[in-house]
Amino acid sequence: MSDEEQRIAEIESLASIFPDLLEETTDKQLVFKFDRDIGMTINLPEDYPSISPPIFELSGPYLRREQKEVLHNSLNDVYIENIGFPVIFNWISLVQDFIRDLPEEVAEPSHVADDVVTPMAEEIDDMNIRHGEVLTDRKSAFQAHLAEVRSKEDVDRVMRILKSNTKICRATHNITAYRYMTEINGKPIHHHDCVDDGEFGASSKMLELMDRMKADNVMVVVSRWYGGIHLGPDRFRHINNLTRQILSDNNYGPKKS
């Protein structure tokens, strides 16, 4: 069988075996949602499984760093043991076993739609972070945060402040995009980047929107607290709408004449 035929067969098999876990599927990407708010996005290269490994991204707001490292290393070990063969079934089984073995102290997340916070905790907010309205859809909650940034140090500082807030730190995803300008020898240098944090493809859409709006020297983070019900493409619409709204509310983008 060709790589493409093996991928198609594997995807069909996974959809029939794990229908409750498989949130999204295309011929190049699979998105799984597990208990304990653990998510796994898997991207399939064109030469998988014969040559390249699938690329995975994990999200787990309730996992400690060392727990994530154990899971990450275990997934890599499973691939090494199965080089050249379909491996995703083994990966999903491993994640399920990992979750079953988690201690009870890793609690099930509670719905936070009515408990999303705006004040900062622990870290002093010296970046004047602004917070948008909370949007809820089928028990998931979304909230945008915005700050002016003019360096990578500013970007890192904003993230530290946001994640010092317990609720924001425990969001299922904190999707981030930023743009800022510096000068070298009088020439403007544009800097930009984005981070999906497990919500694959969401941050690049945010950055594209910021580019279209010509929003410079600004960073937007959209927090999503997953409520247990799959939203499909609607979640991308919510993330983009909140990004646009908080930028407009804070006078970023083209100025109206």
From Swiss-Prot:
UniProt xrefs under InterPro entries: Impact (IPR023582), Impact_N (IPR001498), Impact_N_sf (IPR036956), Ribosomal_Su5_D2-typ_SF (IPR020568), RWD_dom (IPR006575), UBQ-conjugating_enzyme/RWD (IPR016135)
GO molecular function, one term: protein sequestering activity
Segments forming domain RWD: 9-102
Subcellular location: Cytoplasm
UniProt keyword annotation of Repressor present: yes
Main location as per UniProt: cytoplasm
Family matches, as PANTHER family: IMPACT-RELATED, PROTEIN IMPACT
UniProt function note: Translational regulator that ensures constant high levels of translation under amino acid starvation. Plays a role as a negative regulator of the gcn-2 kinase activity; impairs gcn-1-mediated gcn-2 activation, and hence gcn-2-mediated eIF-2-alpha phosphorylation and subsequent down-regulation of protein synthesis in amino acid-starved cells. Plays a role in differentiation of neuronal cells by stimulating neurite outgrowth.
Subunit description: Interacts with gcn-1; prevents the interaction of gcn-1 with gcn-2 and inhibits gcn-2 kinase activity. Interaction with rpl-39; this interaction occurs in a gcn-1-independent manner. Associates with ribosomes; this interaction occurs in a gcn-1-independent manner. Associates with actin; this interaction occurs in a gcn-1-independent manner.
Protein name: Protein IMPACT homolog
Source organism of this protein record: Caenorhabditis elegans
